[in-house]
Amino acid sequence: MANPKVHVRKGDLVQVITGKDAGKKGKIIEVIPAKNRVVVEKVNIVKRHSKPSKTNPQGGIIEKEAPIDASNVMIFCPKCDRPVRSGHKFLENGDKARICRKCGDVLDKDK
């Protein structure tokens, strides 16, 4: 079975809409399509106990971001200043870009 498609990409600015971190905004660090999960910067922080190793000689308790379900985040439109649903549109140069459904602004930074 093919991996399900996730509506957000690495580097997108998103807002968490449900759960303990609802309302927080952050950038997507990692997308895990096989599990339909995303890792968002400074959201869903967990504490992990790590043994001393070469990379971390001190060891101890480390705080890091844990994955959350992709359905719990929405793309944040800076022009509307709110989380929005995204649509797709072909631009004049022939590229396909994601757009804000509210204001029509292009959400892809590179397009």
Swiss-Prot record:
Coiled coil: none annotated. Keywords: Ribonucleoprotein, Ribosomal protein, RNA-binding, rRNA-binding. One of its GO terms (molecular function) is rRNA binding. The keyword Transferase does not apply. It holds the Pfam family KOW. SMART domains: KOW. One of two assembly initiator proteins, it binds directly to the 5'-end of the 23S rRNA, where it nucleates assembly of the 50S subunit. This is Large ribosomal subunit protein uL24. The gene is rplX.
